[in-house]
From Swiss-Prot:
The gene is EIPR1. GO terms for cellular component: trans-Golgi network. InterPro entries: EIPR1 (IPR040323), WD40/YVTN_repeat-like_dom_sf (IPR015943), WD40_repeat_CS (IPR019775), WD40_rpt (IPR001680). Interacts with two multisubunit tethering complexes: EARP composed of VPS50, VPS51, VPS52 and VPS53 subunits and GARP complex composed of VPS51, VPS52, VPS53 and VPS54 subunits. Interacts with SNAP29. The modification Phosphoserine is found at S320. The lineage of its organism: Eukaryota, Metazoa, Chordata, Craniata, Vertebrata. Acts as a component of endosomal retrieval machinery that is involved in protein transport from early endosomes to either recycling endosomes or the trans-Golgi network. Mediates the recruitment of Golgi-associated retrograde protein (GARP) complex to the trans-Golgi network and controls early endosome-to-Golgi transport of internalized protein. Promotes the recycling of internalized transferrin receptor (TFRC) to the plasma membrane through interaction with endosome-associated recycling protein (EARP) complex. It comes from Homo sapiens (Human). One of its GO terms (biological process) is positive regulation of endocytic recycling. This is EARP and GARP complex-interacting protein 1. Residues 310-335 are annotated as: Disordered. WD repeats lie at residues 4-48, 55-101, 124-164, 172-214, 219-258, 263-302, 338-379.
């Protein structure tokens, strides 16, 4: 059973920002933002044609500045946010804005893979997230499964909840909270939990993870020294409401139960340099992706702490007598956690990995040299999980 070869797409600029087009659940589509100091920056809309194993692309100009973070609306295929650098009075500021792509590009491209002659189109600015009083924006996260009207941005030591009004053309600051403590505290990343009616957000600053209640903007849990060095990223298990994963500069990936934060439930130490990204699969939470500046992407099978630790359990009525004994044996033993695959198509630091929002078995990774790689979960594992 041969696996499909990875598909590689090269951007002409350096890049570190990647997101699936979250509201698109039929076509496999990713958005990539570039980081160029000399030229106009771009957002590449990457369409993956699964049947022919080829990539089609469209390019949008992002003239506001180099893109550090990109995030797509869960409700509107055409709307996205970016965090970008701009210079003002010889200072560099990281700002955030909400944009709309041209209507005809929302549902993908029919451009041939090698057609680079077409002119790039520009994004329509819907609104800025005003950060004059709050500092540099680290990231923007959308309310999961929401109507695309609520976002949270992290700016220096502030967590800001925004209401998007008038078709996203106006961002109103609904509430905010600040990190208090010694030194210059700064958020590095955050995720919005899909559980608890979307009332919880987790953030990382320095080596600490914190949970926040978005209704009162108060802290609900705190994991100090979650990592030995800076925490780079975190993600919530989509199927287990108290579980989250974190990764950092100590080369580790840790899994936490927020009801008992004294120590991690599990720790992975497979990378040899900083781990920049951790992502749970949206459907099968045992599948966890990580990307690191050791230039590798690792797919792990964390089945023992997943929502199906005994594998796919079959209903008793569905089992014939001959199968009965075999399946009983199988279901008694929890399956073992392991590294499924290490992907080594990158030659530079991998700053972003993410799953497709349309195909649960497909993911993309992006390295700083502008190389985007599309890979799939190995077929043998896919069928093992499904059957």
């Amino acid at each position: 059973m041969e696996d499909d070869a990875p598909v590689i797409y090269g951007l002409e600029f350096q890049a570190r920002a990647l997101t699936p087009q979250t509201a698109e659940t039929d076509a496999i589509r990713f958005l990539v933002g570039t980081q160029s100091l000399k030229y106009d920056n771009q957002i590449h809309i990457i369409d993956f044609d699964d049947e022919n194993n080829i990539i089609n692309k469209n390019v949008l100009l992002h003239q506001a500045g180099e893109i550090w973070h990109i995030s797509a609306s869960p409700a509107d295929r055409g709307v996205l946010t970016t965090c970008y650098n701009r210079t003002s009075d010889s200072k560099v500021l990281t700002c955030a804005a909400v944009w709309r792509m041209p209507k005809e590009l929302e549902s993908g491209s029919h451009e041939s893979p090698d057609d680079s002659s077409s002119t790039a189109q520009t994004l329509e600015l819907l609104c800025h997230l005003d950060n004059t009083a709050h500092g540099n924006m680290a990231c923007v996260v959308w309310e999961p499964m929401g109507d695309g009207k609520k976002i949270i941005s992290l700016a220096d030591n502030h967590i800001l909840l925004w209401d998007l009004q008038e078709s996203s053309s106006q961002a109103v600051l609904a509430s905010s909270a600040s990190l208090e403590g010694k030194g210059q505290l700064k958020f590095t990343s955050g995720r919005w939990s899909p559980h608890h009616n979307c009332t919880q957000v987790a953030t990382a600053n320095d080596t600490t993870l914190r949970g926040w209640d978005t209704r009162s903007m108060s802290q609900i849990y705190c994991i100090e020294n979650a990592h030995g060095q800076l925490v780079r990223d975190l993600d919530f298990n989509p199927n287990k409401q108290y579980y989250l994963a974190s990764c950092g500069d100590d080369c580790k990936v840790k899994f936490w139960d927020t009801r008992n934060v004294t120590e991690p439930v599990k720790t992975l130490e497979e990378h040899s340099h900083w781990v920049w990204n951790v992502r749970y699969n949206h459907s099968h939470d045992q599948l966890v992706l990580t990307g690191s500046s050791d230039s590798r992407v690792i797919l792990s099978n964390m089945v023992s702490i997943s929502s199906e630790p005994f594998g796919h359990l079959v209903d008793d009525d569905d089992i014939s007598d001959q199968e009965d004994h075999r399946s009983e044996e199988k279901s008694k033993e929890p399956l073992q956690d392991n590294v499924i695959a290490t992907y080594e198509e990158h030659e530079d630091s991998v700053y972003a990995v993410d799953w497709s929002s349309a195909d649960p078995w497909l993911f993309a990774s992006l390295s700083y040299d502008g190389r985007l790689v599309i890979n799939r979960v190995p077929r043998a594992l896919k069928y093992h999980i499904l059957l």
